[in-house]
Regions:
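Nucleotide/pyrophosphate-binding catalytic subdomain
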Residues: 1-147
């Protein structure tokens, strides 16, 4: 349980973070944890303090699990290697599902949210003689859009 003195200590920092943008990155496995709802409540608290939040999620946990369920080998689960077509299709499926679950959780806390295309990326192409297939490289983040 939080003590009143702890709360006072926290509250003195709030004014310096109002209207700021926090980027929170979470692993996909966390979304399925029973305590994920607490993270969503923390995000709701940040929003109530006029702190903007961008939530970025991974999906490798769900990708591995779906591939195993379907008996389909995957070429790249952690985002660092070559991504083939079948792996890309599975990754898109799990990412869309996960985004939907997160949006539902945010909505249940009266938070409005949207999935964006603020990440500008291009195919990695051929690197050191290796065709990276569907693996991409982030060129930039449209941070003006996120603000």
């Amino acid at each position: 349980m939080i003590k009143l003195t702890d709360l006072r200590e926290i509250l003195r920092y709030v004014p310096s973070f109002r209207e700021k943008l926090f980027v929170i990155s979470i692993d996909g496995e966390i979304v399925e944890d029973e305590h994920f709802a607490n993270i969503l409540l923390d995000i709701a608290l940040l929003r109530s303090l006029n702190i903007r939040v961008v939530l970025v999620h991974g999906a490798s946990y769900q990708l591995r699990r779906l591939a195993e369920e379907m008996g389909q080998p995957i070429s790249n689960a952690d985002g660092t290697g070559i991504t083939d077509g079948p792996t890309l299709r599975l990754a898109l499926t799990v990412s869309n599902r996960l985004s939907h679950e997160i949006l539902e959780g945010l909505a249940s806390n009266d938070l409005r949210a949207a999935c964006t295309n603020a990440v500008v990326a291009h195919p990695a192409g051929i690197l050191r003689g290796v065709d990276m297939q569907f693996t991409g490289r982030v060129e930039r983040i449209d941070d003006a859009f996120l603000r």
